Each structure stands twice: as structure tokens, then as C-alpha cells.
Amino acid sequence: MSKKKLSKGQQRRVSANHQRRLKKTESKVEWEDSQLGDAQEGIIISRFGMHADVEATDGVVHRCNIRRTLSSLVTGDRVVWRPGHESLAGISGIVEAVHPRHSVLTRPDYYDGIKPIAANIDQIVIVSAILPELSLNIIDRYLVACETLEIEPLIVLNKIDLLDDESRQFVDKLMDIYRALNYRVLMVSSHTQQGIPELEQALTDRISIFAGQSGVGKSSLLNALLALDEERILVNEVSDNSGLGQHTTTASRLYHFPHGGDVIDSPGVREFGLWHLEPEQVTRGFIELRQYIGSCKFRDCKHENDPGCAINAALDRGEIAVERYDNYHRILESMAQVKTRKGFSDTDN
């Protein structure tokens, strides 16, 4: 006998009950005020349920409790915390307050709406590669997310050592599409170190987060940039059959680059869904389309074969790259398919 399918409301209640049971089982140390030292500044370098690792200004990391009013605390948050005079059950302090964020990286969740996964990000490094496949569509999806979140992007094309001269010219011409839009593009190889000094310079004095599909070499790049020996960002062997790497990072964590700057490695960036956006937001996410918004003959213009479409006219004049225009419509189509498949609508929020 087949199981009865749960409704969306039932699924949310099951998930909420599960989270409540998990929280009840967590070891929670209760501090008396007399057991705590003076308040000081720190940064969250990782979050685990009701605990967080806080790096103090002297670089020492402390495992801390989190005040119940700070449930949305994420890696990268600047906080005020108080150390305990002695460690209690492995906990050495408590996070008391969080400073306002200048940016927050979020992702959509079918049950909980928009969830923060990292804070105070200065740039999103979009890593792509010629293998397993160079996908401009994936790059454009990440760019839409960056524009929507108002976080500066940096496009990094990895594994360029695998290109011959002719292929490199072709790929370089594709990257000119983004350079023409004033997006920064770096072509690198973690194997030969080509372009790595330029990448290090772009990462200095900033908090970055790396985004990209499995197999493009994110972990290999990060391990090289971080010069990690014992403590490495995990990466599995690439499958001989699929050519896709297996992502094994499970919790967001902030690392310091030896050349300056920081990176937050987070599994959440693999799940940059756009299905929660409105079509108008996607249009604005393509920066070259913004100037034509509101100029079409009809207000409900779909920017396809509609008469009087300002975007199509710009495409005909060569003011918009065909590749970007095609990806724009692919993204809108995929969003509509996901919403239909998941039964998502504004009333579900």
C-alpha cells in the first residue's frame, strides 16, 4: 500500500517538529552573569545549531552559546560576545548581540522562505571551468543572484591549462561578453598557477564566497589559495564516468587567506535557486536589459516575439549579446517549470 502524500502544510509541521526535537537534545549550558567576563568583539566563523565558533580580536576561536533571540546568526556575522571565566562542558562563552550586516547571502527554502547562509560578504566568486562543461547559462544564473543580492561578482574561469591556443581564443571571446558589461573576469589554473597572483590580489582585504557547480575546481582552488596542509576543504575524486566532483563540505566556515582577505566556504551556494524571484527581478538581474525596462509597447511584454518590444529591438541592433538573451529566457522558463512542479505560488510564503 503506497504512502499518503503529505500536503505542504503537513510537511512544514513535520519539519518544524523535527527541528524542535533536535534543539531539545542539544547540550545547552546556562551561564550566570557572574560567570562571564567583559563584552568584546568577534566574528562568527562557523555555526552549529545553538552554538557558534567565535573568533576573538586576538585570533583565538571560542565555542559559544547563542542567545535565543539571535536565531538567524550565520557565518560572517560581527558579534558582541562574553567569555566565561572557565569552560563549561566545552563551551567558553556566549554571543550576546550582532552588529548590522552590510550584506547577507540568502537562498530560497521551500519550507522556511528565504534563509540567510552567510553575512557581510564583499564579493561572490563565480567559478566555472572548461571541463566538465563551460556553461554561460550557469554563470548568468549566478550573476542574476549577485545582482539581486547586491553583492559584487567576480567571474573566475578555471582549468585554462587544458585549452589549446585556438580554444583559448574562442573562450576568451566568450568572456568578452562579460567584460563588455564591466564584470571582472579572471582566467586561472590551480594546476599551473596561471592567474593565481591576480586572483589573490582580487581576494585581498575582502570577505569572499566561492560559487559554482561540482567539478569546476572550487575546492582545489581554495586549498591552493589557503595553503592548507592538515585542515583541508574536503573534495572527493572526480568520477571517471561523469567527470563531476563530489561536494563534501557540510557546514559554512570562514577561513583566512595567508595573503590577506577571508573566504566563507558554504555548501548553501550550490543551491542558488531563482524560483522565488519575479520575472521582473530576473530582467533587472541582466544589467544590460535595465535601460529598456518600461520602454516596450505593451506593459505585459514577454520580450519574446512581442510587437514593439524594446529588448528585442536592442537585440536586433546588436546592443545585447545573443547568448545572454537566450539564457535570460532559459532562466525564466526553468523558473516557471520549478514553480509548476513544486506547486509554488505567492500564497505559499
Swiss-Prot record:
Amino-acid positions noted as binding Zn(2+) in the UniProt annotation, renumbered to this chain: C296, C301, H303, C309
PROSITE patterns: ENGC_GTPASE (PS50936), G_CP (PS51721)
One Pfam family hit: RsgA_GTPase
The protein's required cofactors: Zn(2+)
Regions of compositional bias (Basic residues) in chain numbering: 1-11
Entry-linked CDD domains: YjeQ_EngC
SUPFAM superfamilies reported for this sequence: P-loop containing nucleoside triphosphate hydrolases
Record text on cofactor binding: Binds 1 zinc ion per subunit.
Alphabetical keyword list: Cytoplasm, GTP-binding, Hydrolase, Metal-binding, Nucleotide-binding, Ribosome biogenesis, RNA-binding, rRNA-binding, Zinc
Top class in the EC scheme: hydrolase
UniProt EC number: 3.6.1.-
Quaternary structure and interacting proteins, as annotated: Monomer. Associates with 30S ribosomal subunit, binds 16S rRNA.
Family of the protein in this entry: Belongs to the TRAFAC class YlqF/YawG GTPase family. RsgA subfamily.
Name listed for the protein in its UniProt record: Small ribosomal subunit biogenesis GTPase RsgA
Organism: Pectobacterium carotovorum subsp. carotovorum (strain PC1)
Phylogenetic lineage: Bacteria, Pseudomonadati, Pseudomonadota, Gammaproteobacteria, Enterobacterales
